[in-house]
């Protein structure tokens, strides 16, 4: 049986609530209900009673000479009951080493509604590719993740908070039509610090 998220799952409801989802303190929302998010650090609206968020945490941790930039792997967070505006907080970590330990298993995100109530969720670490650049082509990885679990979405369930005509015109119709340079730039922006270092090292080795 398919697990349906989004508008299709709410045919029995006459009132669809558009919930605002706000990432906090270094949380990036990369995809929402299968749709790529243009501004990962900005609030967005989701027109559905449930949401699947692909998120990543990035922040400078530590102090002084021990300060380092930490980038987590992407995690798939599922919220089954999205009945109010929410804020998504990262786990409380204060050093690079602590963050490594926290995100190595099941990080403790905190999702809080405007009512002050803590919202329940489930999560899985997104499975990447083997070897170099494990999260290159993230859209395909998410599609595979959802296909394996029988998860489907209705079209148009996600709206950016602000969408301008210029942005709609400039955005490529499909990733497949983008040339290799655009795809590399797209991957580089989403890559973690360690992935970027590995990519730069690989580039030097090719020269």
UniProtKB/Swiss-Prot annotation:
It comes from the Bacteria. Pfam families: DUF2057. Keywords: Signal. Residues 1-18 form the signal peptide. InterPro entries: UPF0319. Disulfide bonds: none annotated. Belongs to the UPF0319 family. This is UPF0319 protein VV1_2115. It comes from Vibrio vulnificus (strain CMCP6).
């Amino acid at each position: 049986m398919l697990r349906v998220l989004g508008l299709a799952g709410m045919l029995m409801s006459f009132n669809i609530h558009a919930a605002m989802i706000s990432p906090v303190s270094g949380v990036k929302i990369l995809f929402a209900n299968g749709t790529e998010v243009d501004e990962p650090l900005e609030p967005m609206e989701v027109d559905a009673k449930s949401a699947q968020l692909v998120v990543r945490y990035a922040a400078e941790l530590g102090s002084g000479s021990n300060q380092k930039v930490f980038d987590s792997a992407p995690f798939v967070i599922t919220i089954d009951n999205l009945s109010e505006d929410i804020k998504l907080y990262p786990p409380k970590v204060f050093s690079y080493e602590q963050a490594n330990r926290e995100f190595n298993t099941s990080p403790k995100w905190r999702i809080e509604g405007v009512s002050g109530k803590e919202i329940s969720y489930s999560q899985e670490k997104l499975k990447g590719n083997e070897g170099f650049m494990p999260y290159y082509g993230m859209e395909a990885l998410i599609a595979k993740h959802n296909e394996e679990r029988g998860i489907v979405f209705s079209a148009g369930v996600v709206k950016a908070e602000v969408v301008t005509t210029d942005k709609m015109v400039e955005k490529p119709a499909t990733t497949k039509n983008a040339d290799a340079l655009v795809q590399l730039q797209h991957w580089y922006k989403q890559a973690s610090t360690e992935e970027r270092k590995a990519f730069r090292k690989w580039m030097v080795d090719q020269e």
